[in-house]
UniProtKB/Swiss-Prot annotation:
It is found in: Cell membrane. The chain crosses the membrane at residues 3-23, 86-106, 131-151, 152-172, 233-253, 263-283. Belongs to the MtrE family. GO terms for molecular function: tetrahydromethanopterin S-methyltransferase activity. Pathway: One-carbon metabolism; methanogenesis from CO(2); methyl-coenzyme M from 5,10-methylene-5,6,7,8-tetrahydromethanopterin: step 2/2. This is Tetrahydromethanopterin S-methyltransferase subunit E. It is a multi-pass membrane protein. The gene is mtrE. It is an enzyme of class 7 (translocase). It catalyses: 5-methyl-5,6,7,8-tetrahydromethanopterin + coenzyme M + 2 Na(+)(in) = 5,6,7,8-tetrahydromethanopterin + methyl-coenzyme M + 2 Na(+)(out). NCBIfam families: mtrE. HAMAP family: MtrE.
Amino acid sequence: MEPLIGMGVLALIGVAATIAGASEDLESDVGSQSNPNSQVQLAPQMMFPHRIFNKAVSGEPPSNALMCSVGAAVATVLISEFTLSPLFALVLGALIAACVHGTFAVTSTMGRAASQSRFKQPVYLDMIRSHTPVIMGYSFITTFCILVVSYLMTVVLGHPFPLTMLAFIWGITVGAIGSSTGDVHYGAEREFQQFEFGSGLNASNSGNIVRYGESGVRNGYDNSWFCAKFGGPVTGMAFGMTVFLGSWVTTVFDPAVSISRGWISVVAGVIIVLILIFWNWKIEVKARNAYGPYKEDKTEEASA
């Protein structure tokens, strides 16, 4: 393959991965999945009923791995057995995966709310009807972009793994990045805005999430709107960089050409990792110097 064509395909893969990362994080924010959902689940037990979609089908990595694997399996069958166009096959695969994910989301949130009836947590059918299409829409975008990435890597770049296996791996990866990157913005900032930033979460405040929004009762739409400003884009950038930089070294220094090029790609990958570690350290040091540690106010100091 010509180097320019390879870099062009790699750029397209990076764009698709960036979109997939952003949509995955916003999907988890609308449905309240992964780590922050433990507080949403705990809120009714602490006498704080809410109108937040409480699905948490599972952790984000296995949830997205299942979603992407289903879409890839359907697309593979349509391409190989029915000779359907790859584009239409990927779209139909993502659509079926979104329907499967939507089914799990509905049964999950209804089951969780019903199990908390003793704590006076209602099952809001209007909330379920309004949020489920949004969750399915985000999951469709995520799955389709992951399928595009996997298909291009398999067919164009000649990756040895089959489409379904690659989609499974990238599904786990995008879920893990969304859980560790974007969910911090939702859980640490959006759920506990009534407490001073940087103060941490006292055990006595567990479950005391923000239940009222800028206008009316807060729901998943509000959380997605807030996280689209920072958490979603950062997740997209993180996943996009992971996919792009991970494939860039082997595209520029193709191991198939010679063994020496293969070792050069390994060295280039290590250098990139070291640069990112140093960059992350500099950002953390700058943030600590700019904002400093959390300081107790006078009333807390007096009581201590």
